[in-house]
Amino acid sequence: DGSLDQIIKKWTASSSSAVPTTSTAAGLKATPVKAKYIIASDSSFAPFVFQNSSNQYTGIDMELIKAIAKDQGFEIEITNPGFDAAISAVQAGQADGIIAGMSVTDARKATFDFSESYYTANTILGVKESSTIASYEDLKGKTVGVKNGTASQTFLTENQSKYGYKIKTFADGSSMYD
């Protein structure tokens, strides 16, 4: 019905090409098993989820899960413990699901059932504008910050010996920039 496109465009400068084509017909209803679901999410991963100036969680994921709940006729309780804790909450049965801009990996598929992807993103390396770092080779001997538990952390760990950098993990994205 175009809701996903509208949400993505509101929060990003991305075109519709960032929104994957799905095989599920829009508006197709399922019968909820429960009247209320506990959904865990990240606490700081803008534009997907972050706190606004009123300390309310907002962003793509927050709008999307609320739209899904409304469309499918169930209530949600959203918790924002952070990415690692959200994953742990679902694994421990403390939450029914997670919405957190999570990359789909083979390891995660072994543990979780995923919806169809709603956004296509790439792993990128960000540096200060004045930096001379232009490639992974330039990271030799440097320390690279990454959010714990992410696909980016997996990528960096898998390539650490190849490029010779150190890895420093952070519990949330905003801490990397402080």
Annotate each PLM feature.
Residues D84-S88, A100-T111, F155-Q160:
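A ligand-binding cleft/hinge motif common to bilobed small-molecule-binding domains
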Residues A18, Q94, D106-A121, S161-G164:
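Ligand-binding "clamshell"
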Residues V127-V144:
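Flexible hinge/capping segments at coil-to-helix
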Residues I68, V90-Q91, L139, M176-D178:
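Hydrophobic residues within well-ordered alpha-helices
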Residues Y57, K142-N148:
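Short beta-strand->loop
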Residues V49-N52, I65-F74, S152-G173:
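Ligand-binding cleft/hinge of the Venus flytrap
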Residues D1, W11, A26, A30-M102:
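Extracytoplasmic small-molecule ligand-binding "clamshell" domains
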Residues D1-W11, S152-L156:
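Periplasmic-binding protein-like
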